Each structure stands twice: as C-alpha cells, then as structure tokens.
Amino acid sequence: MLAPMDTFRLFLHVLAASVWVGGQIVLGGLVPTLRKISPEAPKLAAQAFNRIAWPAFGVALVTGIWNMLVVEDLDQALFGIKFLLVIVSGAGAAIHIVGKSKAALAVGGALASVGAIAAMYVGLAL
C-alpha cells in the first residue's frame, strides 16, 4: 500500500496525463465532425482544449520529476526514455499550435499524439 502522499502524487500524475493524452485522442476524433460544422470550429475547439491541456501537461511534468526524485528503485534509463517522449509530445503540440502549413500541423499533431501515447505506455512499465 502506498503512503498517502505517494497516492496523491501518483493520482495527480495519472489525472494530468489522462487529460493530456485522452484529450488529444478525443479532439482528433472530433475534428472531422467539427470541420462539417464550420471551418473555424476545429481551431476554436483546439484553443479551448489548450486552456486545459497545457496546465495538465505542466502538472504531469512536475509530478513526473517529483516521482523521479522520491521513488528509490526507479529505473532511470526507462524514466529517461519516458521523459524524452514527454518532451517530444510537448514539442509536437507546440509545433501544431504555431504551424502555418498543413505539413507542420500534421507533423506536430502526430509527434504530440504518438509521443504522448508512447510516454503513457513506457510509464506503465515503470
């Protein structure tokens, strides 16, 4: 059984990661429908998502570093891989936000989603 603070830290981490990863998956699924509503609808939905997603990304990042500092038997190599995937996901999302071309939007979105899903998978191995 985990200590109460460990449970709280892990809860915050999983909740934040779920918002970041799950939100990308849900928004990706909604884009075709949003495009039918209005050409601007996907952009407006993405902007609304960003107001929730980026704070969640920050919480996941902070609690992930917190985990690294307090978990004694943490596999450092595996944690390093996960951290790199998280950075790839965040960078991809940033590229997707500022990208002007279809290629930048596609590459940024793919990096964000694949990096996030891969980080979640590696996190389960920790």
What are the roles of these predicted feature ranges?
Residues M1-L126:
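Polytopic transmembrane helical bundles with strong interfacial aromatic enrichment
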